Amino acid sequence: MNVIFQYWLDKNGVGKNHDFYNYVNKVVDISKNYFKEYANIHNAEYFFSNERTVKTKSNYFEVCRIYLDPYFDKFDKLLFVDIDVIPKNMKENIFNLDVKDIAGWPEHNHPARKDPNGWKLSFPLEDRFKKFGAPIIKPKTVKNNIRIINTGVMIWTRDARIKARKLFDNHEDYFNYKNPILDKNLKNVGHSTHCIDQPFLNVMFNKYDFDVKELGIEWNRTPTKDEDYPCNFAHYTGNNKKKIIELYG
């Protein structure tokens, strides 16, 4: 049996106060309902949480529940999806993909993207990888000078989750390192997003030599110039979340 996991936590005062907090509950409900249906179609369990289970300053690191919580050990594959993701194509079964450890979409400048890729190798980002003992790895299927898997859509196998629980570094050590969210006086340490879940997990994947399957944009279509650009999962990142209410509400 496989499982789909989503979560949403109310803001806790750490990080930016985005305007989407004003309407996010509707977005959450829409995404939940779509993925409940997707789970039912593909014979998977659906699990949603709004409880804090991971000891962390930042809500982003609740995603680490994927591997920290032994509750999920009874499931084969775990699909994690952010609450701003919609399965536009219900027929395609992501659980049929052959995954050894984890699978996700590598950030890059896909020609269909609405916004440019913000995840490129920079000195501050390279410093973080080096600080935590991780090599810089380039993607195999797309062009970019660093492989950064977008953590908004991920498949994790049971073996990968158990392995991560045993091996991965403490996420708070990563979050506390040169973090401009926590220390406003820090200069030239990179963007605040360098301190949160996406780079942390990618550092861990590289450090502990996880087998990373690179998915095509059809499984994590971040905002595109053309809403009709074909995909299985659409990911309405950043300030595009209202689109979920407009299109699916």
Positions of PLM-derived features:
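Short amphipathic alpha-helical segments and helix-helix/interface helices
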Residues: K32-K36, Y67-D69, K91-F95, Q198-N202
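A general structural motif
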Residues: M1, K74-D76, K100, V212, ...
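Short, polar loop motifs at secondary-structure junctions
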Residues: S31-N33, P87-K91, E218-R221, G238-N240
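Catalytic core and acceptor-binding pocket of nucleotide-sugar-dependent glycosyltransferases
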Residues: T141-Y248
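Short, flexible, basic/aromatic active-site loop/helix in glycosyltransferases
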Residues: E126-N144
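GT-A fold catalytic core of metal-dependent nucleotide-sugar glycosyltransferases
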Residues: T56-E126, M154-R161
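N-terminal anchoring/stem segment of glycosyltransferases
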Residues: M1-F75, T237-I244
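A structural signal for short, well-ordered beta-strand segments and their strand-loop junctions
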Residues: I4, Y46-S49, L79-D82, A103-W105, ...
